From Swiss-Prot:
It comes from Caenorhabditis elegans. Probably in association with the cell surface receptor unc-40, positively modulates the BMP-like Sma/Mab signaling pathway through interaction with both the ligand dbl-1 and its type I receptor sma-6. Regulates body size and this may be through modulation of the Sma/Mab signaling pathway. Interacts with unc-40 (via FN6 domain), dbl-1 and sma-6. Its main location: membrane. This is Repulsive guidance molecule B homolog drag-1. It comes from the Eukaryota. The lineage of its organism: Eukaryota, Metazoa, Ecdysozoa, Nematoda, Chromadorea.
Amino acid sequence: MSIVYLVSITFIFSVFKPITSCRVEECAAWFQKTKDYENLVPKATERYCQVLQTYLKCMNDTQRYCHGNLRFHSSELIMRRHWKEFECEKWESCNDNSHVKRKHVNTCYFNPPPSNRKLKYCSLFGDPHLIMFNGSVQTCSEEGARPLVDNRYFLVQVTNRNVRGEALTTTVTKVTVLVRKHNCTASLRYEASSDEEGLPRGFVDGTTFQMTSKHSVEVLWQDDNYVEIALHFIHSSIHIRRQGPYLSVSVRAPTIVLETGGDVARELCWSGCRKSSRIPAELAVEMTKKFAECYRRRVHVPKKVAEDRCKDIGNIGVFFDACVFDLMFTGDDYLVHLSRAAESDFRRLAPHHFQSHVTQQHARFQKENQHKNHINQSEIFKKCIPSKSIRFYPFLAIFFFALLSLLC
């Protein structure tokens, strides 16, 4: 009976174990990258103390998950010695109740402007199509909420749902941006939903910017269909567009900012869509009938008509392909305008990456076309609609608890 009990408890805890863990590696990585990026050396300077303070705050936040972690305790001890040795407390803001005049510190430091090579760009638009940080392009069909980008400074979460009632036809209907508390900003939240009449003009608390010597964060509202959330202190920006019942979102940020995140496997911009939800959009356009039958999709617009329409608005490359796919299988001109806006944003926000992206995609398409005649078309579209997964874990847990009650 004791063996059964132990096995059961072990199983249950393995299923429901918490996902939290010690983030000492993440804190150390951020600290080291910031030092390297700014050429900081350990000495009694205001900037080094400010970075050290942020590092110690990171360590303090993860302390309860690091009991018994030798690296955590040794690193924290060394850094606290630095804090004391360099008299970093003198750089802290003075107490409002104190009558002793101390040097007041401006704790908000803007990062140096990054070069084009150190900028990353990611975009999600249409039915939906994903351009990842590495330049890869995917077309997916996922429902529910998932982080697009998640790091120490901000989180962008997208919610996809089916708005047309057709199989595997999803699009972005909600974008949530969380700006995390930092020396340059308080915690801020922005929410955009396709159900609303237009994009909000500010954060949910009613503010539109964070005041420092210059605005560190601000909402740059253009009109009901386009808004930019600018994080000036880290040279990052989030761009949200709206067309009818659809939203699109793009993120531009330096690599050093993006790499302060934790589990990048969950982020769409880094790891992409789940394999089970990816759709071969290029083949779908070429083999329309087989795709439509396998994915239970209706062809709303003939291929030639869709191509002419997308050429008329000036789309090229992957944006042309996305436009054709969306128009063929939805017939919705709103998505045509979103693909055009997505291309325009890419050109404007990351021109260096846009040119290399077009070149790489052209080379990839040429290679794919060389092998297209060798593809066994009968093997491409099979079992396209995944069966609904059954979640066994809760039922198994209940079963084991019932078994324990009978045996004890």
